[in-house]
Amino acid sequence: MAPPAARLALLSAAALTLAARPAPSPGLGPECFTANGADYRGTQNWTALQGGKPCLFWNETFQHPYNTLKYPNGEGGLGEHNYCRNPDGDVSPWCYVAEHEDGVYWKYCEIPACQMPGNLGCYKDHGNPPPLTGTSKTSNKLTIQTCISFCRSQRFKFAGMESGYACFCGNNPDYWKYGEAASTECNSVCFGDHTQPCGGDGRIILFDTLVGACGGNYSAMSSVVYSPDFPDTYATGRVCYWTIRVPGASHIHFSFPLFDIRDSADMVELLDGYTHRVLARFHGRSRPPLSFNVSLDFVILYFFSDRINQAQGFAVLYQAVKEELPQERPAVNQTVAEVITEQANLSVSAARSSKVLYVITTSPSHPPQTVPGSNSWAPPMGAGSHRVEGWTVYGLATLLILTVTAIVAKILLHVTFKSHRVPASGDLRDCHQPGTSGEIWSIFYKPSTSISIFKKKLKGQSQQDDRNPLVSD
């Protein structure tokens, strides 16, 4: 059954970002996604990291079946190197060695990094009790997936294969209790597929039963989703859905380390988990890019196969990313500085006065409620009142009054030395001579900088303006 035509859609540029990325460095993740390591492209060139033998170069093994002369285009990963490879689809990577043992001129490679996700490892089995104690069966057509499917149908978490024909199921969290064995000790071929490893004599290879399931729900930050029936070829007429939902993720990074779909009618789709809109579609004639990002935290993975042309399938590796949002900074007040102007008249030597003009401005880098250089909070001023509330403002006012008093005292001393008589109040109205006695002083105070004093001449003077600058009408 073909997928609904309604899901035929264009790629969403807003939700899907294609981006080529470099391959992961060795040791940062799994280097194999197949059960037999046919996809291994690592750089191990010894049969074992400890006590192993060096591998021969593939371009120097012309006397053997596999070499660069016979496979010059890099088939099977061969080349001018001596890295372990699996060009013939054996149960694990191998290489030619110089020292023959009983006429054997090659050896399997023990590669810790070449273990497909879902493969829990190779373990010892002493038999009483076995590592998995749920149920078991034997079959002369056993494969990895037939054993996994059998255990999954019985609601078990783990499936184990031993000696190529025995299948064990269980939920035992201590399946490792008898000890772990080298992966090469579980290389007995499955009776149903000679390219798959199915344990060994007294050795059991374990798998998670989620491997190869048709559908599932994923919420972990990262995981691998395999095509149905993996590592066997996917069956005909498959329609499978997997949900990948990681709340809080800013985007999910996807890559296809394995993609073997040969029919254009068989397809893999990524859908928006909320709207079910198709974000991307891949099939035999449209392969996925190396990697890409989906800017969602909820994605549905869909797979459809028709009734012909089966293949190996796919492995999808996803990694959710949660980005911490930067803390919001308080808004900077960019408005015009609020100017509070108050006038004060001070009597100087019998009605000789000087007026003080206060201009308090806000610093562009501070909100108007905050006095620069102080942690105190000052409440906002009323629209119809010149009175400023708050202890901080009173402190500033006191400082200004003291400053003005000092200036006035200095003026008085200057006037006293230059004049020996104090004019009467009536004479002040007719006094127009220039000098400091008839000049008005203005002080502009900016909290963020300093106090500047300059002279400002006023045309009209009134003795009725002798008021405290902080007292309103």
Curated annotation (Swiss-Prot):
CDD domains according to UniProt: CUB, KR
Sorted UniProt keywords: Cell membrane, Disease variant, Disulfide bond, Ectodermal dysplasia, Glycoprotein, Kringle, Membrane, Signal, Transmembrane, Transmembrane helix, Wnt signaling pathway
Domain of life: Eukaryota
Cysteines joined through disulfide linkages: C32-C114, C55-C95, C84-C109, C122-C186, C147-C167, C151-C169, C190-C198, C214-C240
Domain Kringle: 31-114
Gene Ontology terms for molecular function: transmembrane signaling receptor activity
GO term, biological process aspect, one: cell communication
Residues listed as glycosylation sites in the UniProt record: N45, N59, N217, N293, N333, N345
Ranges in the topological domain labelled Cytoplasmic: 414-473
A cellular-component GO term for this protein: plasma membrane
Pfam families, per the entry: CUB, Kringle, WSC
SUPFAM superfamilies (alphabetical): Kringle-like (SSF57440), Spermadhesin, CUB domain (SSF49854)
Extracellular-side segments: 21-392
Essential for apoptotic activity: annotated span: 414-473
InterPro entries hit by this protein: CUB_dom, Kremen, Kremen_rcpt, Kringle, Kringle-like, Kringle_CS, Kringle_sf, Sperma_CUB_dom_sf
Subunit structure: Forms a ternary complex with DKK1 and LRP6. Interacts with LRP6 in a DKK1-dependent manner. Interacts with DKK1 and RSPO1 (via FU repeats).
Protein name as it appears in the record: Kremen protein 1
